[in-house]
Curated annotation (Swiss-Prot):
Pfam family, one: T4_y05I_C
Protein name: Uncharacterized 21.1 kDa protein in mobD-ri intergenic region
Lineage, uppermost ranks: Viruses, Duplodnaviria, Heunggongvirae, Uroviricota, Caudoviricetes
């Protein structure tokens, strides 16, 4: 399976070289020279919500990555144990990160597959998927199963025909009244 890759150069510095962000499958990769740091979509959102008051401080993005801010300049570093990205300007960086994230984030999507399967992807949390499956159970009729995967944990719900009909009736009644965000 080929990976989908999108890339944006965030800044070019004579001292540190090209800083770029790429989306590879469901991860965001920041690169500068030989250094490379990976972030989940939720970590990118967290990064864009950090406020920088131009004071000396260290802010954790996750267990591995930390941002080092400095009071003397608008630049900062994003560090892991063995990697360091040096960025010249916080405001420009965040503006470009938000633009890239918004242009590459996954939208709600329904994908149909053969043999009565479908996958619904969630745009809010890109690690969430709902898999719908209709299986033939010869003695008891068809069975609808719903498997929800969130942050790589799986929850399975199995519905018999009467339960599936009740769910469909409920959804038919509430979907017209739902407010889109």
């Amino acid at each position: 399976m080929m990976s989908e890759a999108k890339r944006l150069v965030l800044e070019v510095s004579p001292l540190f070289g090209e800083l770029a962000i790429e989306k590879v499958n469901n991860m965001y990769r920041l690169t500068q020279e030989d250094d490379m740091l990976y972030f989940t979509p939720s970590e990118i959102v967290r990064l864009t919500q950090i406020e920088y008051a131009y004071t000396d401080k260290i802010v954790s993005i996750n267990d591995e990555h930390k941002i080092h801010f400095y009071s003397s300049c608008p630049g900062f570093n994003i560090k892991s144990e063995s990697m360091c990205l040096s960025i010249n300007n916080w405001d420009n960086f965040i503006t470009n990160i938000k633009y890239f994230y918004d242009s590459t984030k996954r939208k709600h999507n329904l994908k149909w597959f053969k043999k009565c399967n479908a996958i619904i992807t969630n745009s809010c949390n890109q690690n969430d998927e709902t898999i719908l499956n209709v299986s033939k159970c010869y003695e008891e009729g068809d069975v609808v199963s719903i498997r929800q995967i969130d942050d790589f944990r799986s929850h399975i719900i199995t519905l018999k025909k009467e339960e599936a009909i009740a769910l469909k009736t409920y959804l038919d009644s509430v979907i017209p009244t739902m407010i889109s965000k």
